[in-house]
């Protein structure tokens, strides 16, 4: 009854971009839709809402809404570039534990 998850940032050197899972045009369109990164391979905004984008309609992954049904959800992630998507994941209200580095933790707590 636990899920250990992470998030991905939305930038040219992200894992999704480096693996060619998204291209520059898709990255730009995701930004335009308000995406800050991905949670469970679904693109979310700063409030943790899944953005309206074609990539979210064709992904095969645990729907982020299902995270609410898991008793213990642990998010392990850190780094300056991931702060917006970590914040989005936390804003969803389904994360129970955050494992991160000191710098990221301080930025999240102090804005």
Task: Pin down the residues of each PLM region.
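Conserved phosphate- and dinucleotide-binding cores of soluble alpha/beta proteins
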Residues: 1-111
């Amino acid at each position: 009854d636990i899920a250990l998850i992470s998030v991905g940032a939305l930038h040219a050197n992200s894992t999704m971009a480096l693996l060619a899972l998204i291209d520059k045009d898709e990255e730009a369109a995701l930004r335009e839709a308000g995406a800050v990164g991905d949670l469970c391979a679904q693109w979310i905004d700063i409030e943790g809402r899944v953005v309206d984008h074609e990539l979210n309609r064709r992904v095969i992954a645990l729907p982020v809404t299902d995270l609410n049904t898991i008793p213990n959800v642990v998010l392990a992630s850190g780094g300056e570039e991931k702060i917006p998507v970590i914040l989005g994941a936390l804003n969803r209200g389904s994360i129970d534990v955050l494992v991160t580095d000191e710098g990221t933790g301080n930025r999240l707590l102090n804005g």
